[in-house]
Amino acid sequence: MASTSNTDRVIDAGMIKKAHPEQTPPDVSHEGDVATEKGDSDGVEQAAPTGPTDGTPWVTGIKLVMIMSGITLVCFLMLLDTSIISTATPRITSQFHSLPDVGWYGSAYLLASASLVPLTGKIYQNFNTKWSFVSFFAVFELGSLLCGVATSSKMLIVGRAVAGMGGSGIQNGAFTIIAGCVPMQRRPALTGLLMGFAQLGIVIGPLIGGAFTQYTTWRWCFYINLPIGAVVGLLLFFVHIPEQLPKPKGISVVHIILRKLDLVGFVLFAPAAVQFLLALQYGGNKYAWNSSVVIGLFCGAGATFVCFILWEWYKGDDAMIPYSMICRQTVWTSCVVYGFLMATLLVASYYLPIYFQAIKGVNAMLSGVYILPSILSQSALAIISGALVGRFGYYLPWSLAGGIVSSVGNGLLTTFTPSTSVGKWIGYQILLGAGRGAGLQMPIIAAQNNLPPPLIPVAMALIMFCQSFFGSTFLSYADVIFTNSLRNKLKEYAPEVPPESIIVAGATAFRKAVPADQLPGVLKAYSKSVDYVFYLAVGAAVATFVFSCGMGWKDIRGNEPPQPSGDEKV
């Protein structure tokens, strides 16, 4: 694979100098700062990420445990928040008489989060990492509080939007913190540990939400974030988190806000993202895909995005998304790979429960238990692969293997029928989860290993945006595939049943609206439609394999910069 060019290295040095004129750029030929990659065909030396610049050594021991526990809990809560509301929604709509607002309970969070994510990269690049992370989490907690005390559906939607604003900077902030705390070869293990445990929030969210809704009140779906947030505050408040590059202090912060955050770029990007996501939300649901509203939103998003690209090109290295960074093969392929990975994860997370609830006839809580094999195997492989990458140094084999295994796993899901045995759906899910887990963190490691410290926060933000963008897009595609297929298959397998009555009834209530003699045909139509959705996931998994080839064959075990001496506290 092509390694970073000399031109890119010169650009990196220029960006560091431009961002911090009081410092000289790092000597790219210094032995301690360069790791020569033997596997590169051109033998070009690769600048290795530097360590903390605030005079502190890498974080170890109990302080590292406290930091990792804190950021893992925060990421867990954020992912829990995305799924816990699903089982509480029926009770919420009954209390507020707000069935037409159901879509906004999820999309308000998504719109606010996706539109802010790129700006969070500039925030972490220019401001104190620890306090930026804590601030985003505080906003997330405020949103949770607003949702918990909501007295109307509109107040709940506002609370979800506020929580989304806070959530926009949590994951990329966690990855940036890990990059500043430990050397490169230790990051895969810690990143895998964080992602492995945090993503348990996705699967246990519906279980906890169902329990709260049934035995206490749906408001505890949001209140639960508050006491855990207090624990996180105690874990992080008194621990120093090293910085990978100098950050401004005092009055210079005002200069950074005005000149370095690229607020114009944000003002152009945010409406483009919101219009695009709204078009996906409305299309095929509230409005037809060929309606003037949906077409207008797509056109508005495209026009605004063109203006955003032109502005970013004009801003150069001070742009919210620097052109010199996004043109790097490792960066853009990492973004695409992570986006496709999240697409496969979300498609399975949404449609496996539909298979179990609609076709197998189980309730929401039990369907959450039934998808545990994929989530647990994913978490286990994320932790194991991270440890092994740190030990042997190469991330690309894991990403390629993950794409292959995930493709096979999704392919096996397309064979599901109403009579699929327990052993098969457990085994297929284990294979699927293992494939996703093996490659889940590799795009993050690839980007961090190939970028200088000033660009790591921006790259993490861009990768997180691709997570939202690809996830939303593929879920919309999946919805179109499922709905159209269900209409066609109902005509084939249950011709006496009106397709629209089944679609309107929903995945859990259609059994009551179907005559007993027609139910087997309806179940078969449902099963075939879910199978077609998994074909889409197969395509996304294959794409992760293809684009992984561009992430580069690099050994992360390069020489680290000399550690600062002294007995300063971490």
Swiss-Prot record:
Residues glycosylated per entry: 290
Application notes: As colorants, MonAzPs are widely used in various food products for centuries. Moreover, MonAzPs also possess wide-ranging biological activities such as antibacterial activity, preventing hypertension, lowering cholesterol levels, causing hypolipidemic effects, and displaying antiobesity and antitumor activities.
Cell compartments where the protein resides: Cell membrane
Keyword Ribonucleoprotein carried by entry: no
MF GO annotations: pigment binding; transmembrane transporter activity
Major location category of this protein: membrane
The organism's place on the tree of life at top rank: Eukaryota
Pfam families assigned: MFS_1 (PF07690)
Transmembrane segments: 65-85, 99-119, 131-151, 162-182, 192-212, 221-241, 263-283, 293-313, 336-356, 369-389, 392-412, 425-445, 455-475, 533-553
Membrane disposition: Multi-pass membrane protein
Induction conditions: Expression is positively regulated by the azaphilone pigments (MonAzPs) gene cluster-specific transcription regulator pigB.
SUPFAM superfamilies: MFS general substrate transporter
Membrane recorded as keyword: yes
Effect of a null allele: Does not affect the production of azaphilone pigments (MonAzPs).
Family to which the UniProt record says this protein belongs: Belongs to the major facilitator superfamily. TCR/Tet family.
PANTHER family: MAJOR FACILITATOR SUPERFAMILY, MULTIDRUG TRANSPORTER, PUTATIVE (AFU_ORTHOLOGUE AFUA_8G00940)-RELATED
Protein name: MFS-type transporter pigP
Organism encoding this protein: Monascus ruber
Lineage, top ranks: Eukaryota, Fungi, Dikarya, Ascomycota, Pezizomycotina
